[in-house]
Amino acid sequence: MKHIRNFSIIAHIDHGKSTLSDRLIQVCGGLTDREMQKQVLDSMDIERERGITIKAQSVTLNYKANDGEIYQLNFIDTPGHVDFTYEVSRSLAACEGALLVVDAGQGVEAQTLANCYTAIEMNLEVIPVLNKIDLPQADPLRVAEEIEDIIGIDALDAVQCSAKTGVGIAEVLEMIVKDVPPPVGDKDAPLQALIIDSWFDPYQGVVSLVRIKHGELRAGDKIKIMSNDHVHTADQVGVFTPKQTNTGILRTGEVGFVIAGIKEIHGAPVGDTITHQKNAAPLRLPGFQKIKPQVYAGMFPIASDEYESFRDALNKLSLNDASLFFEPENSTALGFGFRCGFLGMLHMEIIQERLEREYDIDLITTAPTVIYEVVTKKDGTFQIDNPSDLPAVNDILEIREPIVEANILVPQEYLGSVITLCVDKRGMQTKMSYHGKQVAVTYELPMAEVVMDFFDKLKSTSRGFASLDYNFKHFQTSDMVRVDILINSERVDALAIIAHRDSAQSRGRQLADALKELIPRQMFDIAIQAAIGGHVIARTTIKQMRKNVIAKCYGGDVSRKKKLLKKQKDGKKRMKQVGNVEVPQEAFLAILKVGK
């Protein structure tokens, strides 16, 4: 056991985590040069296209250190984006140490900070690594000072490396062996294995990634899932090197996979404990706190007969992505679908893309909303995540919106424009401190403003230099209203949004104008209205198409022309009474773009 080292790699987006993982795999000979490819651990197509890590991946490598001993390194490459912090905290629970990778050109960023504090709270040994020293703008000394100043860990002897060129990788490996403590555990105690991650394989059933805390697990053992007492036989046990390799045994302190032919999707949930059927452990290991979704949206299959396969796809995805929440929903405009909860807008985009690619389902997604607390005269306080669930205006005493604490790190020259942006988004500044050339500002912002497009705007106002990390703080009373969209005097429930009263009129106007462009013209006028309760705040009209009915009249009396025009007018009137307006798919997407 003293030769095992479990560690994670944590960093801000684009600081080179996945490339560093590639180098570690290459140096330790995990894959041959022919099998090696860029970002070998980013196995999903979406990860490669976007250049981001979404799922944490684990790898076991054997490394011969300078002291002549062979060490088993189990490491987990984690995502860097703020939407996937849950993946990071889960990975850290399986480790004793963490490599904190910082770009030597850009320095410390907000997500570096957040992930590092998570690691320190879990009592992990944090090893700073300065990456990208081959870049012309790299300034390792300044960045080392920044790490000490902002995070407060000793970084003067931090390893300097370039994951791209391979410089300094050997030093990184030696630091891991020297500084990361070996795991502790009792190999003779009853088996306790923590499930860190799981996914569904169509041929093998549920594949679980586990960390053995006590005891050992062999292929052929009868194992019990402690949350539901189901008993299975461990068919295959092994590690990822990064290829799936059967070893037949996992010992105390190791990280590997177990396949037990579990066919029901939630048969071995993440955070659960596996033990032996006969010599069972008395207690479960403390799992992970259930994460609450921050953003909700309705998802509906375009073809109504795909509903069951859509449910199936969501079930399989939720096994692999424990932070996805969903429940059935029915909309008058869109039929049957699901109300889904996500950690943020990027998470929502990724899930939608994975459903369309991996499961081949075409979806319509409604406008995302956050959770609001509503206090009513009749039913007291309750939470809603869907604008159409909001009770009648005269029954509401107050609406409370969620407020987040946003920590922003920004270079001094862009501070002014970032403060302006935060004020526009109804933010309240609570803290500001200077660290060298960087400024750390803390704002309390409404979550609804942050999840929509705040991240994109922050990046564009600071030319990409500002970084953001946020977490939920509390609910606060606010003047929120529901803006309904009426098409031909009929309410379309899927187009409703909740907005602040100050911005409701402009949001309503933008929505009406966007719909005017997208809904095709009919044979009669279509009125598009935005309304709060019974009060219309914006209106626009799509003009009818009309045939020139008097083209065939040559001369003759004017009453002949009037008669034809009146006949046409009456026809249009009848048509309007019975005519239905189809709202195209693009109209629902337009809401997502409004306000950007």
Curated annotation (Swiss-Prot):
One of its GO terms (biological process) is positive regulation of translation. It is found in: Cell inner membrane. The keyword Methyltransferase does not apply. Its main location: membrane. CDD domains: EF4_II, EF4_III, LepA, lepA_C. Its EC number is 3.6.5.n1. Signal peptide: none annotated. GO terms for cellular component: plasma membrane. GO terms for molecular function: GTP binding; GTPase activity; guanosine tetraphosphate binding; ribosome binding; translation elongation factor activity. Residues 2-184 form the tr-type G domain. GTP binds at residues 14-19, 131-134. The keyword Lipid biosynthesis does not apply. Keywords: Cell inner membrane, Cell membrane, GTP-binding, Hydrolase, Membrane, Nucleotide-binding, Protein biosynthesis. It catalyses: GTP + H2O = GDP + phosphate + H(+). It is a peripheral membrane protein. Belongs to the TRAFAC class translation factor GTPase superfamily. Classic translation factor GTPase family. LepA subfamily. PANTHER family: TRANSLATION FACTOR GUF1 HOMOLOG, CHLOROPLASTIC, TRANSLATION FACTOR GUF1-RELATED. HAMAP family: LepA. Required for accurate and efficient protein synthesis under certain stress conditions. May act as a fidelity factor of the translation reaction, by catalyzing a one-codon backward translocation of tRNAs on improperly translocated ribosomes. Back-translocation proceeds from a post-translocation (POST) complex to a pre-translocation (PRE) complex, thus giving elongation factor G a second chance to translocate the tRNAs correctly. Binds to ribosomes in a GTP-dependent manner. This is Elongation factor 4. The lineage of its organism: Bacteria, Pseudomonadati, Pseudomonadota, Gammaproteobacteria, Alteromonadales.
